[in-house]
């Protein structure tokens, strides 16, 4: 594992040139190859609710967006997505949704336990936002294996510029530490290029990842949504995202690191580039086709048509072209 002080990280992300960029890319990919071989883990993403109580300023699903199309999948629909995914070879299902009050602990625990009962060889990852310690514990006891909760920014002032007053960075971080304590494989992460972000803030994000020591980290470029206050902002810089992926791989060699949908949205080859810079996870969409375009976190999101998870052969070909292969095992986090 590599380590770097804040001043070294700041210098790296503010002054890197093409030579530094390529050197870090090669080191990161070599590190991933040493630990995982050329394996890329696939996770089946099920976006089960576009209803959210929160009003995050950057998100297309924010409560106050009256143009958003709202839906929620039934338990049977979620299980059907899992069945389709299992037949396609997926062994991890990622259940992601807005903070929708319909999905109480009783409802979610019933869904999780049924997935584990029907598909005992599969891992269940949840991404349901901020919940109580007791809620996280119940979901874990029902069979959930992993939990994704991006912190978005580790700078308190910056967090307040991206979220309404009722949300706090302290609570977000406490949730992450609670998840770790309970025993989840825990995922944090942040946007790159979000409004008001500075290089110093990105360094804070990297140091927080070092401190939290999550099993997973999801980063991607900020992508504006037309129905938010940041609609006229530019999207995050792809090169900087790739640079940060490489740095995270070197700081945390064993981490599960996705090449995110947002990266593929901003750059047609974004996911391949992410893999070449140290990522080792991709998350195709298993959601019902009729709802994919409605889970609109940001504009122009890819994977909204028939091609998403069904085109598993296409994804395999794309990975093969860069010397990697997709694998269908659970892909759990392990220490060296």
What are these regions (language model features)?
Residues 28, 56, 95, 149, ...:
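Conserved, mostly hydrophobic/aromatic
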Residues 1-19, 86, 210-336:
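Auxiliary Fe-S-binding modules of radical SAM enzymes
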Residues 30, 36-77:
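Canonical Radical SAM [4Fe-4S] cluster-binding loop centered on the CxxxCxxC motif
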Residues 46-48, 99-101, 128-132, 153-155, ...:
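Active-site-proximal loop/turn and secondary-structure-junction residues that shape catalytic pockets
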Residues 3-41:
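An N-cap/entry alpha-helix motif that binds or orients negatively charged groups
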Residues 132-139, 195-209, 264-276:
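Catalytic cores of alpha/beta
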Residues 63-77, 85-106, 112, 116-176, ...:
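Core AdoMet radical
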Residues 43-46, 66, 94-105, 157, ...:
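Glycine-rich, proline-tolerant flexible connector loops at the mouths of alpha/beta enzymes
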